[in-house]
């Protein structure tokens, strides 16, 4: 895959005219396959692999398959795939796939998913049926005949590239963990059986032969000899069933600063809309990004750019929620200076492919004096040893109390410098404690504070923690 690039121009700024500038990086990097749509297949049995399958949907016009994605989304939005099952698992040395999208099971009642009109094929050899992809399935070799059925290519299936003009690949697994889940399903035992199936349109019932139906129970697998057993199931979870399938819109790239030759001239950060923020006129220009620990929902970590890159690469349980606020990295505030710096931005798409761009920034003007540098105070980071992966940020006075009285909090060092709660020099950041996870904290601005107070009673407001730039 090629990431399309539109060059970022060199920039020049005057300190006496502006203190920061925003550049929309989505105008300079484009993934030709996706706009950032991700489908989540949520398995009822979360012991199968990771319990879910995440798929990047190829909805971009041009190189993607927007007709197939829109067709798939119409079934998702209508709830048609809720409680849907994998109805066939096939594996040989030449082919390996699992098939779904045709039937639902609820209270042991099997129903046919009502198909919409067939869609136009969008097969491309650049989107072939390789391991980890999903395609619209056709029951025959007739072109333009795909409807509601889809197939996960667990292995490479070159035959699907020629069936009826080719099965249209419209997505790919987000990560190796998702492919592992596909393999876990494909490794389950299978059975051949006849099941009564209800047509919801006519309410009629008809017997249907299921060949190589994967089962979550070894006791009902069989050796494929006739006569096939009739309805050996006693529980819904003996089927491989998806509780639901949803589609989210996410940012199609993760952006990082690969290099910045003089961050004292310009600090580079990113918001969660794909904007690059260049700061050059503030003594609080060190960005802190917020991550939520998905293993402990409602617990958070705030980190700078270097630690952010390490988390993005190595700790998938921490989900980035975007730029939180800006502080200073040194006691007398971040340096404001004129000069030039060369910045390189790396864009990594949802499938892990990346591209880089470099550009130059020049800053001129008269450097203002930092009259408030003596108002900056130090905040330290503590990790709660009783709940690993959860953190507290405290000023020095509170830090002394924590060191003396709360040995479960392990000090990890200086987190940042910023203004105290009563300085009236920045924007207030409020501290909440999560009573569902006592000893865990969240730091938010005014707007999010009001939302939490209105909607999340488990978070208790403890007051203004500090003031920052945002």
Roles of regions detected by a PLM:
Residues 45-47, 261, 295, 351:
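Solvent-exposed strand-loop boundary residues in beta-sheet-rich modules
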Residues 16, 25, 257, 304, ...:
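Extracellular/surface recognition and adhesion modules
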Residues 2-20, 25-251, 271-282, 330-343:
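Cyclophilin-like peptidyl-prolyl cis-trans isomerases
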Residues 251-270:
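Short, solvent-exposed loop/linker segments at beta-strand-coil boundaries, enriched for Pro/Gly
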Residues 282-332, 368-470:
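Extracellular glycan-binding segments that recognize GlcNAc-based cell-wall polysaccharides
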Residues 347-349:
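Conserved structural position at the C-terminal beta-strand
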Residues 353-365:
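C-terminal edge beta-strand
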Residues 1-9, 362-369:
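Short S/T/G/P-enriched beta-strand
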